[in-house]
A protein has these predicted regions:
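Residue-level signal for inorganic ion chemistry
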Residues: 31, 117, 149, 207
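SAM/dcSAM-binding transferase cores
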Residues: 198-239
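Conserved Class I SAM-dependent methyltransferase catalytic core
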Residues: 14, 20, 143-200
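Conserved SAM/SAH cofactor-binding pocket of Class I
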Residues: 33-127
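Mobile active-site "lid"/loop adjacent to the S-adenosyl-L-methionine
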Residues: 118-148
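Class I SAM-dependent transferase core
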Residues: 1-39
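Short, structurally constrained coil/turn elements
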Residues: 9, 88, 180-183, 217
């Protein structure tokens, strides 16, 4: 069922979702806030954009060209509707295409920043795939994997341009190895915890094209207090 929801604590942003597929989560808020280091960007692109939560949030924080890329037509349609109800069709462009084909469309050194909330899970003979193809493609590396993401990023990122991802901690080594394979140097890493005393369940990582070798480990990010409420650092992200 298609519904319109408020984008978490953003009072003036709404998002179109289909409750039969997947719902927008905090991942995208964390990614958008982590990725932005300054406001001097000219061109930003969001891979695996889904129904466009990351471009929506970025549009609140920077004034530049923002593009989202979504391969699944049904999800792309949700993204288009999301832009329309927020009156952002003039500020954000959504492409219905495969990320792997972006290098055929854009010249080398086009983008200052790439953001990506990719499918988290590898696919093998033991993978438990969802009956819904749309859910499966959103969660598993059936249509795109880390190799694809970083090989394309190397081509379309400007020199020293950055790519930021939100991912699972058990894929950290895979991510770093793949980054370095494509001359994208890991620059910042932040571990995210649901609450104090819990295990890390999410990572935020940034790499720079042809960057110097210097990885900065940021302070841990805690999401909830003991009562399940957002901590102040998280609340501030919705400003």
């Amino acid at each position: 069922m298609e519904v319109v929801n408020r984008l978490l604590n953003y009072k003036d942003l709404n998002i179109v979702q289909n409750t039969d597929w997947f719902n927008f989560s905090l991942d995208s808020v964390l990614l958008a806030n982590f990725a932005l280091q300054n406001k001097s960007y000219k061109n930003i692109i969001d891979f695996c954009t889904g129904n466009a939560p990351v471009p929506l949030i970025l549009s609140r924080k920077v004034n530049c060209n923002i593009t989202g890329v979504e391969i699944q037509k049904e999800v792309y349609d949700l993204a288009r509707k999301t832009l329309e109800i927020n009156n952002l069709t003039d500020r954000i462009k959504i492409l219905n295409m495969d990320v792997k084909d972006l290098a055929k469309v854009y010249e080398t050194d086009t983008f200052d920043l790439i953001t990506c909330n990719p499918p988290f899970f590898k696919v093998n003979e033991n993978s438990k795939l969802n009956e819904s193809v749309i859910k499966t493609n959103a969660r598993h590396e059936t249509l795109i994997n880390l190799e694809d993401i970083f090989s394309v990023s190397k081509k379309i990122l400007k020199n020293n341009g950055t790519i930021s991802l939100v991912h699972r901690p058990d894929r950290l080594i895979d991510i770093i190895l793949c980054m370095k394979k494509y001359n994208i140097e890991p620059k910042r890493l932040q571990l995210v915890y649901p609450r104090y005393g819990s295990e890390c369940n999410m990572i935020l990582i940034e790499g720079a094209k042809n960057g110097n070798s210097s990885l900065k480990i940021l302070p841990p990010l805690y999401v909830h207090d003991k009562d399940g409420n957002y901590l102040e650092e998280i609340k501030n992200m919705f400003q």
